[in-house]
Amino acid sequence: MYDADSGKYKRHWGAYGHKPEDTNLGNYDPDAPPAQQFRNPVHCAELAKDGLLYVCDRVNDRIQVFKKDGTFVKEVFIAKRTLGDGSVWDIAFSKDPQQKYLYLADGANEKIYIILRDSMEILTSFGDGGRQPGQFYAVHSIATDSKGNIYTTETYRGQRVQRFLYKGIGTVAKVDQGVLWPRSK
């Protein structure tokens, strides 16, 4: 961590708040106990308004949550059986004052997850692999605007931005919604 005003180094830490090590952890094994260190690359670190820091441990398929001083708070695994590039690529928070929701881009499984931030419960996901609207080709980054719309970008050969319009909050019929196909007005 660096001081935002002065740019001075303050502190750093690894998984679970441990001192980081650069030891090669070998390949990720979803059946093994959770790695006690982050695997490379740690793909995002986002600070919520309440002061909690969310870290995307991409190849370990998990988000770890910390206090600003490095104290470990909790973790959640997302698509834990994802090998290779991992499932936790980027996150964004909803724009309500409490940042009630966390949105996660999973580039390996071509999905966006909507997660209840306080419990880290997955409420729903949408998307699938492909090049049509509503599909993803290595969804890499995610952001939200002041109106609650979600924006995604893709890497490798995806090379596009998609916008998903916020239409309100309602009941979700199933956990995985698949592709959200565009509808005519």
Tell where the protein language model's regions lie, with residue ranges.
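Eukaryotic scaffold repeat domains enriched in small/polar residues
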Residues: 1-185
